[in-house]
């Protein structure tokens, strides 16, 4: 999954407003000095997420590429991933030493999944603001992603969410698959996600 076999491809999915772009930004800033990193963002009709990452200086602009998927965003990460595979190939041409590519999906529902041809690892982001019941509703993003990120844990008291219930439901729905609570704006929970990526992505620890 590392250089010999091409870069490690990490899919980041989740509903609109859950924190996908913030997670992508935090991961890029944490990893960019240790690894060669690039990002592909998916939006339906714009390149807004790519622009956000560029403005936040998550990476240099030539390492950020936005693709406009049109229609349903899940099609570009699952049924027909060609637009993303072409973007990854272009990033490989630009940066032959590329080690990590993040593929951020457009906002989608709990049924969104990444094609195994596109992503080696998948991170799925939900927000406590969506409701305490989200983990137990299931769906492939909840049950089959490699790591489930439950974001905006700091807002739980304000939206009347019991994090203990969410934790129990997530554990029950995911079995042995890992998950974690995050407050991405403050960076809480990010180190644990990075540890997971390095350990499970075949990366050399640096």
From Swiss-Prot:
GO terms for cellular component: cytoplasm. Keywords: Chaperone, Cytoplasm, GTP-binding, Nickel insertion, Nucleotide-binding. Gene3D superfamilies: P-loop containing nucleotide triphosphate hydrolases. It comes from the Bacteria. GO terms for biological process: urea catabolic process. One of its GO terms (molecular function) is nickel cation binding. HAMAP family: UreG. This is Urease accessory protein UreG. SUPFAM superfamilies: P-loop containing nucleoside triphosphate hydrolases (SSF52540). Belongs to the SIMIBI class G3E GTPase family. UreG subfamily. GTP binds at residues 14-21. The keyword Transcription regulation does not apply. It comes from Brucella anthropi (strain ATCC 49188 / DSM 6882 / CCUG 24695 / JCM 21032 / LMG 3331 / NBRC 15819 / NCTC 12168 / Alc 37) (Ochrobactrum anthropi). Coiled coil: none annotated. Facilitates the functional incorporation of the urease nickel metallocenter. This process requires GTP hydrolysis, probably effectuated by UreG. Homodimer. UreD, UreF and UreG form a complex that acts as a GTP-hydrolysis-dependent molecular chaperone, activating the urease apoprotein by helping to assemble the nickel containing metallocenter of UreC. The UreE protein probably delivers the nickel. It holds the Pfam family cobW. It is found in: Cytoplasm. The keyword Chloroplast does not apply. NCBIfam families: ureG.
């Amino acid at each position: 999954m590392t250089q010999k076999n091409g870069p490690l491809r990490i899919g980041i999915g989740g509903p609109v407003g859950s924190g996908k772009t913030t997670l992508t930004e935090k991961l890029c800033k944490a990893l960019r000095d240790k690894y060669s990193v690039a990002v592909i963002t998916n939006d339906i009709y714009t390149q807004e997420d790519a622009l956000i990452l560029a403005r936040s200086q998550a990476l240099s602009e030539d390492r950020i590429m936005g693709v406009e998927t049109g229609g349903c965003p899940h099609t570009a990460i699952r049924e027909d991933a060609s637009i993303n595979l072409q973007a990854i190939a272009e990033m490989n041409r630009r940066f032959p030493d590329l080690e990590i590519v993040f593929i951020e999906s457009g906002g989608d529902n709990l049924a969104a999944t990444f094609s195994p041809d596109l992503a080696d690892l998948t991170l799925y982001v939900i927000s406590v603001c969506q409701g305490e019941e989200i983990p137990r509703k299931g769906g492939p993003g909840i049950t089959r992603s490699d790591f489930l990120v439950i974001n905006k844990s700091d807002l739980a008291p304000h939206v009347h969410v019991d994090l203990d219930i969410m934790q129990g439901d997530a554990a029950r729905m995911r079995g042995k698959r890992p998950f974690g609570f995050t407050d991405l704006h403050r960076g809480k929970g990010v180190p644990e996600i990075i540890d997971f990526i390095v350990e499970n992505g075949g990366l050399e620890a640096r």
